[in-house]
């Protein structure tokens, strides 16, 4: 409790009474509840101080954070809907078209944000908004956008503004969308309800590369993806021609769809 009071006092020292009326009213309420010994109301109120402070004193970043959080909700919600539609075999193409529109719009906006502010860290905008930067670039169908921001993401990882696994996923996605073999084994293709790994550059080195970037072994990843049958390096090596054929077919379809936009 004393620690909370200390932070409240700090905010009071730095806040101008002519500004931040909302913040000021929240702080006044905290003092009122303390005097009334209303611990429940105090606990519900003091945790609103940081949000109010950011909204009033970092209004620009606060607005960006809220916008990115909304884009993250869009990005993930439409994918959950597509997953359900695929299971039910209902409205899949309609939902996919909606998802593509969302992805294009979000990628363009996130590109604008990164160009203006750089790759904002969780300390700048919170974890959800920070994740939205990655998701919207990752899910873009525009290879130019993905390739442009891949080195920026790499720098963000180095600076602690993004996660290593995000760099691995975007690296593999960029390669996949160019018809090339992936490095980290993060990308899969689903055909008739069966997952196939996009061909790898080096199956024997993939686990050590994944470990360097903070990812679990590939066999564990494939298991977590919900494969009904076991997966192993030997399985992959024995079926590499099938994986390559399925990937080549996917890539040709991807190029046709891309050219139709």
Predicted feature residues:
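Bacterial Sec-dependent N-terminal signal peptides
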Residues: 1-26, 261
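Preference for long, solvent-exposed alpha-helical segments and helix-linker "stalks"
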Residues: 21-129, 137-144
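Stable alpha-helical elements in mature extracytoplasmic
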Residues: 26, 106-109, 149, 202-209
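Surface-exposed, interaction-prone regions with an acidic/low-complexity signature
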Residues: 38, 42, 56, 105, ...
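Surface-exposed, polar/charged faces of alpha-helical domains
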Residues: 90, 101, 105, 116-119, ...
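Extended amphipathic alpha-helical interaction segments
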Residues: 112-123, 129-187
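Betabetaalpha-Me/HNH-type nuclease active-site subdomain
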Residues: 181-210, 221-224
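A cross-kingdom marker for long, charged
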Residues: 205-261
């Amino acid at each position: 409790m004393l620690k909370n009071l200390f932070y409240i006092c700090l905010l009071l020292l730095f806040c101008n009474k002519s500004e931040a009326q909302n913040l000021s009213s929240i702080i006044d309420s905290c003092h009122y509840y303390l005097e009334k010994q209303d611990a429940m109301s105090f606990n519900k109120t003091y945790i609103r101080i940081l949000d109010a402070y950011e909204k009033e004193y970092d209004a620009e970043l606060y607005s960006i954070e809220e916008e990115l959080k909304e884009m993250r909700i869009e990005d993930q919600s439409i994918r959950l809907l597509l997953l359900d539609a695929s299971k039910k075999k209902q409205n899949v193409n309609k939902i996919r078209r909606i998802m593509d529109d969302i992805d294009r719009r979000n990628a363009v906006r996130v590109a604008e944000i990164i160009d203006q502010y750089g790759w904002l860290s969780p300390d700048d905008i919170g974890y959800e908004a920070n994740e939205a930067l990655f998701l919207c670039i990752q899910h873009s169908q525009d290879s130019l956008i993905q390739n442009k921001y891949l080195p920026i993401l790499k720098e963000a990882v180095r600076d602690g503004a993004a996660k290593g696994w995000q760099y691995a996923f975007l690296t593999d996605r960029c390669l996949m969308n160019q018809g090339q073999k992936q490095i980290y084994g993060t990308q899969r293709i689903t055909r008739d309800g069966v997952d196939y790994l996009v061909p790898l550059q080096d199956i024997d080195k993939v686990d050590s590369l994944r470990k360097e970037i903070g990812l679990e072994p590939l066999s564990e990843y494939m298991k977590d993806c919900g494969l009904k049958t076991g997966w192993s390096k030997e399985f992959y090596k024995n079926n590499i021609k099938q994986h390559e054929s399925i990937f080549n077919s996917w890539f040709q379809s991807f190029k046709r769809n891309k050219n139709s936009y």
